[in-house]
Amino acid sequence: MLEDYYPSTTSYYHGGIDDDLYTAKWGMVMTFLDLNDSSLTPFEGTHFALIGFKSDKGVYINNGRVGAVESPAAIRTQLAKFPWHLGNQVMVYDVGNIDGPNRSLEQLQNSLSKAIKRMCDLNLKPIVLGGGHETAYGHYLGLRQSLSPSDDLAVINMDAHFDLRPYDQTGPNSGTGFRQMFDDAVADKRLFKYFVLGIQEHNNNLFLFDFVAKSKGIQFLTGQDIYQMGHQKICRAIDRFLEGQERVYLTIDMDCFSVGAAPGVSAIQSLGVDPNLAVLVLQHIAASGKLVGFDVVEVSPPHDIDNHTANLAATFIFYLVQIMAQHS
């Protein structure tokens, strides 16, 4: 039995029910699935599993604005309203949440990793609704556990921050996940392939820039680079990064976008990547056929305005699933 795991029992769609797939919405199509069901066997074809990670413990430790614990429900509510375009050949299963208010951050990350591995064993592509960006390490661990030690797994992070902070004194938090991935790779004598899109210089100290400069395998584009380059040059840079790689894990921190587009985040951003450009870049990553799982993190509903941020996060999920279904 999976620890800290609670299957879904609540529908987030409250509109009319229509049996016609031409007019169906996500909330009408999504089906509940219990990962603890021992009778389940691997699914055939391309299907997705949606799981919430109800934790912002890492945000609290990192002195951010707490509230991301509420985001899985907020994102589900927005996603449920969107039209369904994929017919009956693709399924999105809502498998529930990882939740443990009295559990440690490390325990919850471990529980998420076990749930992710279970999804992968069932041939379901994981979609994780964070939660703080501590979500990423649990997601990454689960993906790695589903692979052999020699298998590659590149990481693309759309984020204003590197999240490569040391954690030897403070312990893990929402800003250390990718350093933990890096350290795991070093321990396993693997190259950590990591590409960050949207870095803001005023959000990252010189230690982090120096660490990146000395670390083979880590690349980044600043928000200003992205503004100047346009999506075609960005996509070519991503292609170069993914050359020779078979798998990529994608994580989207909603603080990559300005407060005008994403007011409800743990750490607000004055500057930020244009969401329309982001959609084009995300679609390109999905079209590579290498995307094995993704998450959206750091939505903080108590700080949101008219669900702008939750809706934007749901929009990214919509477009990623559309393209992944066509190229997996």
UniProtKB/Swiss-Prot annotation:
MF terms (GO), sorted A to Z: agmatinase activity; formimidoylglutamase activity; manganese ion binding
Binding-site list for Mn(2+) 1: H133, D159, D163, D253
Keywords: Histidine metabolism, Hydrolase, Manganese, Metal-binding
Cofactor note: Binds 2 manganese ions per subunit.
Record EC number: 3.5.3.8
Pfam families linked: Arginase
Enzyme class: hydrolase
Positions that bind Mn(2+) 2: D159, H161, D253, D255
Catalytic activity: N-formimidoyl-L-glutamate + H2O = formamide + L-glutamate
PANTHER family named among the record's database cross-references: ARGINASE/AGMATINASE (PTHR11358), FORMIMIDOYLGLUTAMASE (PTHR11358:SF35)
Name recorded for this polypeptide: Formimidoylglutamase
Organism: Streptococcus pyogenes serotype M6 (strain ATCC BAA-946 / MGAS10394)
Lineage: Bacteria, Bacillati, Bacillota, Bacilli, Lactobacillales
Gene for this chain: hutG
